[in-house]
Amino acid sequence: MGHFTFIGLCLLAMFLSLSGAECYTCPIDWLPKNGLCYKVFSNPKSWLDAEMFCRKFKPGCHLASIHRDADSADLAEYVSDYLKDDGNVWIGLNDPQKKRTWVWSDRSSSNYFSWNQGEPNNSKNKEYCVHLWAPTGYLKWNDAPCETLHPFICQCKY
């Protein structure tokens, strides 16, 4: 009886220690970060096609949204390692109403921005989607025409 009591207490202790822990598993070759999983895709797509591609993984998947400097730095490092500064990368920020009101495709709050100097500039009045800008090591953002083909980064909650 003592052996079963010991095992039971061990299982209870393990359960209690994990009950508040975040538990998720990202697919192989996805980056786990703050309860989300991120993956860079190097096959260039328009912003809308990239967003639709991300959504096909499972409900709640979108182009990546970035809300803090620390997350921006981590994703920039991940993208740099993956692409080796080979092209800009779509993220989920866009201006669907074309009124310079930026929103994330996952509808999360948009109170953090990391624009490159002079951006967003809406060059030729046709830049309504946002990419991580390769010349800045993917740390800064640039608005661009949504039809432009770029690699992209998806985020999913698993």
Curated annotation (Swiss-Prot):
Presence of the UniProt keyword Secreted in the record: yes
Origin superkingdom: Eukaryota
Tissue expression summary: Expressed by the venom gland.
Span(s) of short sequence motif Mannose-binding: 119-121
Domain C-type lectin: 33-155
Residues annotated as signal peptide: 1-21
Keyword Mitochondrion included in the entry's annotation: no
Chief localisation class: secreted
Localization in the cell: Secreted
Annotated S-S bridges: 26-37, 54-154, 61-156, 129-146
Residue positions with a glycan: 121
Binding of Ca(2+), residues: 127, 142-143
One Pfam family per UniProt: Lectin_C
SUPFAM superfamilies for this protein: C-type lectin-like
Function: Mannose-binding lectin which recognizes specific carbohydrate structures and agglutinates a variety of animal cells by binding to cell-surface glycoproteins and glycolipids. May be a calcium-dependent lectin.
Similarity section: Belongs to the true venom lectin family.
PANTHER family: MANNOSE, PHOSPHOLIPASE, LECTIN RECEPTOR RELATED
Assembly description: Homodimer; non-covalently linked.
Full protein name: C-type lectin BfL-2
